[in-house]
Amino acid sequence: MESSGMTQLMRDLAPESFDDLIPLVALYRPGPLGTGMVEDFVAGRHGKKTAKLLHPLLEPVLKDTFGVILYQEQVMQITSVLAGFSLGQADILRRAMGKKKAKELDSMKEAFIVGAAKEHGIKRELAEEIFALLQHFAGYGFNKSHSAAYALVAYQTAYLKAHYPVEFMAATLNSYLANAEKVSWYINACREMGIQVLPPDVNVSGAGFSVDGHSIRFGLAGI
C-alpha cells in the first residue's frame, strides 16, 4: 500500500471512507493498470465521466464502480440479471472465463445469449457484445470479499502507524528480526520518521526490539 504507484492512486482517488479503500486493492493490479480501467474508475468517482452502459439493467450492478466491471461478483450478477443464470451457473461461467476454458465458454455463451433473449428480449448482437465485455473483464476481476479483507488490514495498519508509530515500527522490526537487510531498511525508515533507534544495551535490551520512551531499543537477537 505504500508503493509509489499505490500512493499516487490514492491521491488520484482521494478516498473519504473505508468503502473507498476496497476498490483500490482491486484496481492496483497488473490487469486493470494496463487497460484504462483505473482511469475510468477515478474519472467516474469524481464525476468527470459518465459510464456508457450497454443495457439499463447493468446500472444497479455497476453503479458503485462507475460502470467498470471490477469484481468477480459483478460478472456473476450480470449473468444472473440479464440471462437468468442461477448463482451456481454464474459461478461456473466465472471460473471458465478466469481459466479460459474454450469449450465450456462456448456452451455458456450460447446459454447466455438464449437466456438474455428469453428474459429481456435482448438481441443476439447485443448479448454477444455484453458477453465479450464480461469475458474481457473476468480475466482482471478480483473477489470483492478478498479486496475488503485486504483493505481492512491496510486501514488498521495505517491507523497504527499514524497514531502509534514507535510501537508499530518496533513490531515491524521484530517481524524481520532474522533478516538483517530488512532490519537495516526499517531502521532507516525509523530515522526518516524521526524515531530514534537506540543501540543495544545488555542492561536494558530484550531479545527483540522494544519501545523505550519515544525511541526504539535495539534487540539483542538482531545483532
For every predicted segment, state its role.
Residues 1-223:
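Noncatalytic, beta-rich nucleic-acid-contacting surfaces in large DNA/RNA-processing enzymes
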